[in-house]
Design a protein with these regions (language model features):
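A short, structured active-site edge motif that brings together acidic residues
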Residues: 68-76
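Short, conserved phosphate/pyrophosphate- and ester-handling motifs at nucleotide-, phospho-/glycolipid
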Residues: 33, 183, 253
Length: 313
């Protein structure tokens, strides 16, 4: 997507110009993994015009494979992002109707070729709210056929659809997952009930390899305390709590996903996996834009408790 944002902490109503960047949930994960040294590819549909090409170039810049991106249609999805500060929360306005990817069909993609030899496939509920369900299911079936691990981040967005609308779609999609990322309310949506421990119940009902959820204590829009929980092999693991001074919180959950995927691909033990994933998310909160521009060594230093903010010379 194209992200248009007022400069600094200006509000929408004040702004006479907008900063233009590109991002989006799965794209953010792909870039995060590429920055961690993982071969990553991104599949979507974008127009052939210059704005569509600029979106492609924004991924290529970080080494993401774009050769399976379908080209056509007229619009790139847009979202407007107003940063929060102190007691004032941030705001997002979506303008995605009629985007190339929202109108795309199964015939636009060759998921079998795109997923050949893939170890992992990641998708989110944001995409499920925009892209036709049969396209998503085709991608998931190709991923399972390729033997890839499938992760799904529930990622409910109230400005895209209602929870009831989302439940109908996600209950078709989530059974394909090996790894589920979400929160207690998301788990209750899928379960149709409110157990004492929704994520544990979901983990057991679906037989996932792992489930993960992040926690966020909001001191203000500028200061949060971030942590996470991971359930795998029947056991649960909690990360440390990390205080974060926020530069840009958009993409923080996607950076968590990238860190989780990286750690699991590399066979990290569960405790270090959740620490690394949260460290990745914390680093993203300090970076402007959607993408997590961080190296493995930086996330590892934070996860190991060795990051002190001093200048590295």
């Amino acid at each position: 997507m194209l992200r248009l944002a007022p400069n600094g902490n200006l509000r929408f109503l004040q702004s006479e110009s907008f900063e233009a960047l590109f991002g989006g949930a799965e794209a953010n994960v792909a870039v995060g993994l590429a920055n961690f040294g993982i071969d990553s590819a991104f599949v979507t549909k974008l127009p052939k015009h210059e704005i569509g090409q600029a979106a492609v170039n924004s991924l290529r810049r970080y080494g993401v494979d774009t050769c399976y991106i379908a080209r056509g249609g007229d619009r790139v999805g847009i979202y407007y992002c107003e940063k929060g500060a102190g007691p004032r929360p941030g705001k997002v306005i979506y303008d995605r109707a009629g985007s190339a990817v929202s109108l795309s069909e199964t015939s636009d993609y060759d998921f079998t070729a795109a997923l050949k030899g893939a170890d992992w496939f990641h998708i989110t509920g944001i995409t499920a709210g925009v892209v036709k369900t049969d396209v998503i299911i085709q991608a998931l079936e190709a991923a399972k056929e390729a033997g890839a691990t499938v992760s799904i981040d529930y990622n409910y967005r109230s400005k895209l659809w209602t929870r009831d609308e989302m439940k109908k779609v996600m209950r078709q999609i989530v059974p394909y997952a090996d790894v589920f990322i979400g929160g207690d309310t998301d788990a209750c949506d899928l379960l149709g009930e409110k157990p004492d421990d929704p994520m544990r119940t979901l983990y057991e009902k679906y037989g996932f390899r792992a489930v993960a959820s992040t926690s966020r204590e909001s001191i203000s829009a500028s200061d949060n305390i971030i942590g996470a929980r991971l359930i795998t092999d029947g056991k649960e693991y909690f990360s440390k709590k990390y205080p974060v001074r926020i530069v840009d919180r958009v993409g923080g959950g996607d950076a968590f996903d990238a860190g989780l995927i990286y750690a699991m691909l590399n066979g990290y033990d569960p405790q270090y996996t959740v620490e690394f994933a949260v460290a990745s998310s914390c680093l993203k909160h300090t970076v402007e834009g959607d993408f997590c521009i961080a190296e493995v060594s930086e996330a590892a230093a934070l996860a190991d408790g060795k990051a002190d903010g001093r200048v590295l010379r």
